[in-house]
């Protein structure tokens, strides 16, 4: 077998099965089952996932979230976007699958996903639910990947990997401030809606987040330290969501009715934490 063919096969295997980065010396990766699922059953595992996020209930108009958009079949978690009738504010049904567990913290998180081919997002991210009784309080969001399979604006979320960190800060007077920090972009090839890709994130510590694509390191994100020296240290929920953006033209009813374009597929999601090798 030629070297080129062998390398190609190796890349295919990595893309299909995922690959954790080498652990630090003296440590090993251990699977975190609370945030892992192969989606091999016939229904969503409700011990692990909500079919409609209780933390972000409605979504961003014109799309909202409906549990009926979510299914597990053919070995995939599927979120099928569709026309929603009878609602003046929302006319598109998307989906927001959220973890039951709320303690995702430092570790490695990855999902094998194929985006829809419409102008809605296909995403994999994490966020904490704030305690609004605190003063001040923060919401932290870790966007591992946000892609859009059909672009109608000039922004390329189809072939460029977009990852970000956001801190939503509310002071004791109710004044809100947002600080965001991302990384350099990386190419998604083939485009996000044409093939499955493994999107990974090593949340190293409160200041360091490394992004991976198909098992390869791409860039590092350093969350803003505007409010605290250790900004990203709060446990989070995991989300797999399809939504509309206020900067992107929504899909047409005809596009939403096309079953070859309207669905985002998650083959699996896997998560790992570090433990000493002697444990």
From Swiss-Prot:
One CC-aspect GO term: periplasmic space
Residues that coordinate or bind substrate: 56, 60, 141, 146, 243
Active site per UniProt: 141 (nucleophile), 146 (proton donor)
Organism (species): Zobellia galactanivorans (strain DSM 12802 / CCUG 47099 / CIP 106680 / NCIMB 13871 / Dsij)
Cellular location(s): Periplasm
One GO BP annotation of this record: carbohydrate metabolic process
Pfam families: Glyco_hydro_16
Chief location category: periplasm
Encoding gene, per UniProt annotation: porE
Enzyme Commission number(s) from the entry: 3.2.1.178
Biological classification of the source: Bacteria, Pseudomonadati, Bacteroidota, Flavobacteriia, Flavobacteriales
Recorded family membership: Belongs to the glycosyl hydrolase 16 family.
The protein's name: Beta-porphyranase E
PANTHER family (UniProt xref): GLYCOSIDE HYDROLASE FAMILY 16 PROTEIN (PTHR10963:SF55), GLYCOSYL HYDROLASE-RELATED (PTHR10963)
UniProt GO MF annotations: beta-agarase activity
Keywords, in A-Z order: Glycosidase, Hydrolase, Periplasm, Signal
Record-linked SUPFAM superfamilies: Concanavalin A-like lectins/glucanases (SSF49899)
CDD domains to which the protein is assigned, alphabetical: GH16_beta_agarase (cd02178)
